[in-house]
Amino acid sequence: DLPKAIRRQRQMCIRDRPQWELLPDIGLYMDQVITLMDRTFSPALPKGEMTKSMVNNYVKVGLIPRPAGKKYDREHLAMLLMICVLKQALSMESISQILLALCEEGVQAGYGRFCAITRKIEESARGGHIELFDEQIDAQEMALRSGVMAALCTIHTCRLLESCRA
């Protein structure tokens, strides 16, 4: 039943992403990072959405910095959380541009901004009207908001389709 699927979908949105202060502030090994990613976005994203080889590739192409002594810190986790959402709809090149723009004042500020944008999109969607572009914003800010919105819409669409099949 579609209304039930829509209610369930709203419960599964990514509103539970951790705030910066709630991200572990100790170094985590790769297996711990993967487990955290699975738990953070379950059930919004499929289990196994982030793999060791993906994380290694993100380091290799420069999307995230190299870990210090094989340990990943808060900045790595925040970057991986943003990548995990954005990759649902965007190319790695687009994700790289968005992350550079988001994090130009540091990863903590960028992650906070990312969370604020996703929260605004989710709140607007529940109200039936997306108000992301109502105020005067430059092209870069519009691209940031549009990219996040595209990723969230892709995630929500996939989950709705899964709910309809169930």
Language-model segments: which ranges?
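Short helix-start
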Residues: 67-82
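Short, amphipathic alpha-helical interaction segments positioned at domain boundaries
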Residues: 83-102
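Glycine-centered, phosphate/nucleic-acid-interacting loop/turn motifs that mediate DNA/RNA or nucleotide
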Residues: 62
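DNA-recognition alpha helix
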Residues: 27-45, 59
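Intrinsically disordered, low-complexity, charge-dense segments enriched in Lys/Arg
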Residues: 101, 105-166
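Single conserved hydrophobic/aromatic residue that forms the stacking wall/gate
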Residues: 1-10, 14
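Short amphipathic alpha-helical interaction segments
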Residues: 48-57
